[in-house]
Every structure is written in C-alpha cells, then in structure tokens.
A protein has these predicted regions:
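Active-site gating loops and adjacent loop-to-helix segments of metal-dependent hydrolytic enzymes
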Residues: 74-77, 81-97, 146-167, 177-180, ...
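His/Asp/Glu-enriched, well-ordered alpha-helical/loop segment
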Residues: 276-356, 360-363
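Metal-associated gating/positioning segment near the N- to mid-region
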Residues: 42-45, 50-113
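Divalent metal-coordination and catalytic microenvironments
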Residues: 7, 20, 25, 52, ...
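Divalent metal-dependent hydrolysis catalytic cores, especially in the metallo-beta-lactamase
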Residues: 82-135, 150-164, 182, 186-201, ...
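Histidine-rich, glycine-flanked metal-binding segment
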Residues: 1, 9-56
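Active-site core of metal-dependent hydrolases
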Residues: 180-295, 303-304
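C-terminal cap of metal-dependent C-N hydrolases
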Residues: 7-9, 27, 352-382
Length: 382
C-alpha cells in the first residue's frame, strides 16, 4: 500500500494538489490534498511526500524493439535487447514490442516470449505480430488467430511502406493486412491496429490514404510512425492528421545531428505546428523506436553507420515541448500516456484515475524523474 500526499497531479489533465492511495496494483482513491489521513492505515503503508512534486501516468512507449534491432549492416550491427530496468529508469511502465527489418534472425515466437518475460518482471508489455515484410510472418497460421489467441499481441507491425527496405507491397496486399488485423481486434476486444513504418520515399502515406479513401476500413486501425522523418513526409502527415488519422512521432536524443543531415523535424516543433494547424491533440503520440537501429545511408543506398534508439527520448521530447515551444504539460504528457493508451485500447492504462493501474511517474518542477511506480511497486528512485 502506498499513500502519495499533497502532490500536483497531471492525469494528464491538471487536477491540482491531491492525495493518491494505491493498494496492490491499482489506484483506489484520489482526493483533495489533506483529505486522506494516514491514520488507520497499516504501519507498513509507504507514505510519499509529494510537496513540490508532480504526478503523471507512467509513460507508454508504443514502439520498442525489445528483442533488439539492426543487422542492416551485417550481423555485427545487431543491437541488444531491452531490459525492464533500462525502460523503467526512463519512466516507461508500459511497452509495445515489435520487429523491424529482420523478421528471420528474430521471430514472433521470441518476441512473445520476451514480452511475457517483461510482464513477469513487473512492468506491462504488449507486442505486434509481423515485421517490415508482407506476407506477414505470424506465430500461428494467420494474423487474425495471432491477435485473437495470443494475449500479448494487440495488432500487426511494424509494416514498412515507402522505404527501400520494405517488401514493396501492392495496395491490395497492404489493405488485406489491415483488414485482417482489424478483424482480429474486433473478435478479441483489442485494438487490432497496424503500426506502419514510413520511409523517406516521396510516396509518403499514399498507401495508407488509399486504404482510408477506397475501403471501409477506418483510419483508427492504422498508426503511421516516423512521421517526422523529413519535412516532406511531415507536411503530408499534417494533412492526414487533420482528416482524423492518428500519427506517431519518433523521439530522438541526437536531433541536432539528424535535423541537419536528414531534414528531420524536431518533435516539439512538429507538435506545435500540428496544434497550430488544428490537429486534434488526442491523435498525436510519441514513441522511441527504442533499441532499434538508426541506420545512415548514402544517396545511392550504401550503409554508412548506425545509432541505437533510446526510450530516454520520451521525457526529453516532453520537456522540449513544455520549455521550448510552450505546449501545456497536460497536452505534452498525453502524447506518451493517455493518447497511446486510447489509440491502442490499453485498458486501465495512461491515466491517473481511480480504478486504473498504479503506473505512475513522480517528477520535480524541472520534469526530472524522481520515482517510477509500475503495477504499484517502486521500480526506480532517484
């Protein structure tokens, strides 16, 4: 049992000073500061003084290569697996794992096993079936069955389009993957969403827009990611988001380099531009591409080198939104809490609310992490 007292709550909406009572893995009571007395609780109840601190939902990183990524420059360039400690120390209490370019050296069986392991270790973890490639490599004999029968699988991804590393799928092939994923979600009560990797081809979101325009499949079944890869793609993504589509920014710890070399759009600037254009803030998310390779290629497609994505970028991007572009904290923090929870149908996640999972971050006034709570247990303390 934990009692957090007199803390300024962003749920993500600003609630002001509150007392928050946690029993086991749930938030059971939220009252005005001073309303929940410590008297009468068990002596072992942990009391946390929240004076001068902020409380937010635990962060949701919706795109992490938990098995590691890379390999695009050869076997020596494979990146390491994610660890629970490596995620929670950056405030991530919920992770969604995926495969990328390599769907052979890493497979869905191993991804599901890794996801189960992270859950058993004390955080919340989900995953996608598939990888860049179409036809999709699944654990069972179909996308629908994977989503229906494997608890951890919530959709398909990351399917690559507009990229030289994709399978160059036809419109019909791409639409069928999204249709099957939707049916799997409908039958299982899950999101049934397709996480779509966008490359730097001028075709941008063409295939996605055709699915939305030419079929009965709603835009809510698709989450395009890496939308800030370059200015051209970002401009198209604003247009897509204005039509109601959800969009996912990829955070970056080395944005000063990528902004110059690759025309990448800085997350805080991109979100500000979207908000100014009238995009619904609820349709915007940020993910890290954690443990994924960040390959660099020459103009003729030659591999030049590789970096590794880090979940640390989530809070860094939120800070830049708040302190550089003056986006309200409740909007900035929703991109890594309530928005991904709603878009991915992660029940009882993403909010500081009675009955929700006790996944929480305590921060100071400079938005530095002080403590992280996952499933009611402290998993990081400064």
């Amino acid at each position: 049992m934990k009692l957090i007292q007199n803390i300024d709550v962003y749920a993500p909406q600003h609630l002001g000073k509150k007392d928050v009572l946690i029993i086991n893995d749930k938030i059971v009571k939220i009252k005005d500061a001073g309303s929940i007395s410590a008297d009468g609780f068990l002596s072992e109840t942990e009391r946390i003084n929240g004076e001068g601190l902020l409380l937010t939902p635990g962060f949701i990183d919706s795109h992490v290569h938990v098995l590691g990524g890379g390999g695009e420059g050869g076997f020596a360039n494979r990146t390491p697996e994610a660890t629970m400690e490596g995620l929670t120390k950056f405030g991530v209490t919920t992770v969604v794992g995926c495969l990328g370019t390599d769907g052979i050296g890493r497979d869905i069986c191993a991804l599901v096993a890794k996801t189960k392991g992270l859950n058993e270790q004390g955080m919340s973890a989900y995953c996608y079936t598939g990888s860049y490639q179409i036809p999709v490599r699944t654990l069972t004999d179909s996308i629908v069955k994977d989503i229906m029968m494997i608890q951890e699988i919530i959709g398909t991804g990351e399917i690559a389009i507009s990229d030289h590393r994709s399978s160059q799928p036809t419109f019909e092939e791409f639409a069928r993957v999204i249709a099957d994923t939707r049916i799997g979600g409908v039958l299982s009560g899950k999101a049934g969403i397709v996480n779509v990797h966008l490359g730097d081809s001028p075709r941008c979101l063409d295939l996605i827009e055709r699915v939305v325009d030419e079929t009965e499949i709603p835009a809510t079944q698709i989450l395009p990611t890496h939308i800030n890869r370059n200015e051209m793609l970002f401009g198209k993504s604003i247009e897509y988001a204005l039509k109601g589509g959800a969009v996912d920014f990829t955070g970056n710890e080395d944005i000063d380099y990528w902004e110059t070399i690759c025309d990448e759009v800085r997350v805080c600037n991109g979100i500000k531009r979207m908000l100014d254009a009238g995009v619904n803030p609820d349709r915007i998310t940020i993910s890290s591409d954690g443990q994924g390779s960040l390959p660099m290629y020459s103009s003729d497609g030659k591999f030049l080198g590789m970096g590794v994505g880090q979940s640390s970028c989530l809070l860094k991007e939120v800070k830049e939104c708040v302190f550089k572009t003056e986006i309200p904290l409740e909007i900035a923090i929703s991109t890594i809490t309530s928005n991904p929870a709603d878009i991915l149908c992660l029940k009882e996640k993403g909010k500081v609310e009675e009955g929700y999972d006790a996944d929480l971050c305590i921060l100071d006034q400079e938005l530095q992490l002080v403590e992280v709570i996952a499933k009611g247990n402290t998993v990081y303390k400064k």
